[in-house]
């Protein structure tokens, strides 16, 4: 997926991180998994959104890419 395929909010933050105006997190996969886990665990959110977040987190965890 390319940044231009993402929503406006993602593109905005991408630009801010790239310009140095927003902090960069070197362990981005860990950050993503933690965020997806928080979404999946939040029972106030719709079930479909929680299931999608859980699926994405599980796929990241099982992938061979690791933060170093």
Curated annotation (Swiss-Prot):
InterPro entries: UPF0253
Pfam families found in the cross-reference section: UPF0253
Membrane-spanning residues: none
Name of the featured protein: UPF0253 protein VFMJ11_0680
Record-stated family: Belongs to the UPF0253 family.
Species of the source: Aliivibrio fischeri (strain MJ11) (Vibrio fischeri)
């Amino acid at each position: 997926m390319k940044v231009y395929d993402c929503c406006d909010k993602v593109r905005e933050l991408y630009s801010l991180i790239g310009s140095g105006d927003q902090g960069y997190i070197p362990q981005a996969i860990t950050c993503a998994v933690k965020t997806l886990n928080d979404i999946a665990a939040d029972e106030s959110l719709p079930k479909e959104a929680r299931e999608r977040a859980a699926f994405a987190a599980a796929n990241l965890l099982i992938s061979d890419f690791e933060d170093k």
